[in-house]
């Protein structure tokens, strides 16, 4: 007796070629679809929901397959031509191949899915994503790396002709490769003046025979180029990270930059490090020209930003984000507001103009000092900053004893979300309202589930797109204590 075809088990093997339609995004930059038989497939490649693709299976699991896309047979209507010629080789942008409208739609779905599936929130009020005014050239900070191993483009490998020397590169690390760097002339997320510095430094380094850093051998002079730009004050910071200090060389670079960009207000720094890593910071800092910092304006506040300070990388959208905190939090002039994970105090100070007192809490001592300096710079007397570990409730309680209890708490934790003990500390303070600022929808959902279990209800979630062309999304979620 023969088993009907529809009842026979379909057996997939490694190396099989399958066809499927991409239906959604998945973790680790993969996409998801199903075979005609209904088997789920995680597909690697530069894809978009709506793409019809052929893919080769490389791993067979009991409940799903993993495959690599071979060819897009029918393109998604969301697709556009990427403006960057090295998109796909550079790891900076993940979604430049789809329209900005589609990016916003994907991000809204990601926030909604996380809150529903991880947080257990039924039909959460996820508002339309607040789009960035500029989808390109929006970053106020960019870090470029220098290497003696240039990442070769596939076109060079196929033609067996090098477009540039293999032993010098200044640009971004190739995805998953800490040694090789993709040499760039232009980053389409960086400001125009940043790209000009990138090319001036490359020409200067090659002319002078400066040795690029070799990460594996821990040899070489030129390591990184870190740039910051103040949109409101039009100031540019150029920070060169090297393995040792060469005063004459830095002076020559200063003169080259000033000759190439005579109208640009600029400060030049040299961070020096002997560490065996590729991080763009140094143990020593030399100010070659200018003040050694830039000043940026958010709203009616000025913030002094040094080479290694944290500051939101999208100035215009940072204002949008902070305005949303005030709006969804319902902050009034009579309120005492606590700002957890306050860093250098940007949110705390932004809130201070709208409430009676704003108290910032941060574990990093240097960040607290920067926050206090920024409060003084702006003449704010209703702010207080504490260096404290949020995981220690009793120490927190003792430090905050002289101050009014908060009606509202704002928390802006790192990407990993709140430590369980820090979350417990926040909930023990029993604010009427919690405004949770998150750059990771999954961890917002995880922490939000615990907040809801402790007597709060989520009233809204407002996504804000801080990073166009990428799959990252910021969200401002509001939780109110149930009566």
Curated annotation (Swiss-Prot):
Gene3D superfamilies: 2.40.50.1070, Nucleic acid-binding proteins, Vaccinia Virus protein VP39. S-adenosyl-L-methionine binds at residues 312, 341, 362, 412. InterPro entries: MeTrfase_TrmA_AS (IPR030390), MeTrfase_TrmA_CS (IPR030391), NA-bd_OB-fold (IPR012340), SAM-dependent_MTases_sf (IPR029063), TRAM_dom (IPR002792), U5_MeTrfase_fam (IPR010280). One of its GO terms (biological process) is rRNA base methylation. One of its GO terms (molecular function) is rRNA (uridine-C5-)-methyltransferase activity. It is an enzyme of class 2 (transferase). Keywords: 4Fe-4S, Iron, Iron-sulfur, Metal-binding, Methyltransferase, S-adenosyl-L-methionine, Transferase. The active site is at 439 (nucleophile). It holds the Pfam family tRNA_U5-meth_tr. Transmembrane segments: none annotated. Its EC number is 2.1.1.-. [4Fe-4S] cluster binds at residues 84, 90, 93, 187. Residues 11-71 form the TRAM domain. NCBIfam families: rumA (TIGR00479). Belongs to the class I-like SAM-binding methyltransferase superfamily. RNA M5U methyltransferase family. PANTHER family: RNA M5U METHYLTRANSFERASE, TRNA (URACIL(54)-C(5))-METHYLTRANSFERASE. This is Uncharacterized RNA methyltransferase CT0009.
């Amino acid at each position: 007796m023969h088993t009907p075809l529809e009842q026979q088990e379909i057996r997939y093997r490694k190396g099989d070629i399958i066809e499927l339609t991409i239906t959604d995004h998945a973790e680790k930059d993969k996409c998801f679809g199903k075979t005609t038989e209904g088997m789920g497939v995680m597909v690697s490649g530069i894809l978009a929901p709506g793409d019809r693709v052929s893919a080769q299976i490389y791993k067979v699991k009991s409940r799903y397959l993993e495959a690599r896309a071979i060819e897009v047979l029918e393109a998604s209507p969301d697709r556009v031509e990427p403006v960057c010629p090295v998109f796909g080789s550079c790891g900076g942008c993940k979604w430049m191949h789809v329209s900005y409208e589609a990016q916003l739609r994907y991000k809204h779905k990601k926030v909604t899915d996380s809150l529903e599936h991880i947080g257990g929130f039924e039909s959460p009020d996820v508002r339309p994503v607040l789009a960035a005014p500029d989808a390109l050239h929006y970053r106020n900070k960019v870090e470029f790396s220098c290497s003696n191993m240039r990442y070769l483009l596939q076109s060079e490998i196929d033609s067996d002709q090098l477009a540039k020397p293999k032993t010098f590169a200044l640009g971004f690390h190739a995805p998953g490769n800490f040694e090789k760097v993709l040499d760039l002339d232009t980053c389409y997320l960086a400001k125009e003046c940043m790209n000009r510095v990138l090319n001036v430094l490359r020409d200067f380094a090659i002319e002078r025979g400066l040795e690029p850093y070799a990460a594996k051998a821990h040899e070489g002079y030129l390591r990184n180029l870190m740039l910051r730009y103040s949109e409101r004050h039009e100031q540019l910071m150029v920070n060169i990270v090297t393995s040792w200090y060469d005063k004459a060389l830095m002076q020559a670079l200063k003169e080259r930059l000033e000759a190439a960009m005579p109208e640009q207000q600029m400060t030049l720094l040299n961070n020096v490090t002997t560490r065996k890593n590729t991080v763009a910071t140094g143990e020593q800092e030399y100010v070659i020209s200018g003040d050694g910092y830039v000043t940026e304006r958010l709203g009616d506040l000025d913030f002094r930003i040094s080479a290694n300070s944290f500051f939101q990388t999208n100035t215009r959208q940072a204002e949008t984000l902070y305005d949303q905190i005030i709006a969804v939090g319902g902050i009034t002039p009579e309120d005492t507001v606590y700002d957890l994970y306050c860093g250098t105090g940007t949110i705390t100070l932004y809130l201070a103009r709208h409430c009676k007192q704003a108290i910032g809490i941060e574990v990093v001592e240097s960040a607290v000092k920067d926050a206090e300096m920024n409060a003084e710079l702006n003449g704010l007397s209703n702010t207080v900053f504490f260096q404290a570990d949020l995981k220690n409730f009793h120490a927190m309680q003792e430090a905050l004893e002289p101050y009014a209890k908060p009606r509202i708490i704002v928390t802006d934790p790192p990407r990993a979300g709140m430590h369980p003990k820090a979350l417990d500390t926040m909930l023990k303070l029993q604010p009427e309202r919690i405004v949770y600022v998150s750059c990771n929808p999954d961890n917002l959902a995880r922490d939000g589930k615990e907040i809801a279990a402790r007597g709060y209800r989520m009233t809204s979630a407002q996504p804000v797109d801080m990073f166009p062309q990428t799959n990252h999304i910021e969200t401002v979620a509001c939780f109110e204590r149930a009566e």
